[in-house]
Amino acid sequence: MNNSATTRRISKIALQYNGNDKGTAEMVYSNNLLSDTAENQFQEMKAVADRNKNVKNWALTGYISPERSDENEISNDVLVELTLKALEKVGVTKDNQIRLDIHNSTKHKHIHFVVNRVNTHGQNTITAHKIGELFGQAVREICKNMNLKTDVEISKEKKEKMLENLQKSLGKASNFDELITEMEQLGYKVILSENVKVGVSGMRIVKISDINTETKRN
């Protein structure tokens, strides 16, 4: 599963974005937050973060995005469980403030998280150093424990399937245009790399269902 995590100082806009997603967002979990609105929850988080002046980038934000596949669709409950367990691996405790939102405006749902690194006792529980790498490792470990495919496994399977389909298409096509058509029929888009000096310099092949026309931001 694709994932990202970073530490930063946020404004209320981050929570508002996570809680909106063009009207499709669903808040699926919160912890140590009394308010229902993004703006008030930000004020709660900021008040707790201010208890530890040494922590400047007090928010841990990011997302987990499962593979875009109808047959591999996972439930909201499983996605929440996966996220909470991965967050626990990088230092999140029952005393941290957490908000999780599931977004549905893109081709496949994904979950966003905002966590206060400063817990309700004023202690920083999450180390910023290599947090993206550590969170990715945590997600892969939890995926294996929950019998879910990791991002590495999915990437390998997709590459093997693409090469198999490319071999089939090369056997049928007699020119490049036919190759593009054959691959398109199998669900792939062939994108040429071109420049003025050398013309076509290469190509890349992407699964059409993986092309995301929306710009996803944390």
Task: Label each PLM-derived region with a short phrase.
Residues M1-N218:
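N-terminal nicking endonuclease/strand-transfer module with a His-rich metal-binding environment
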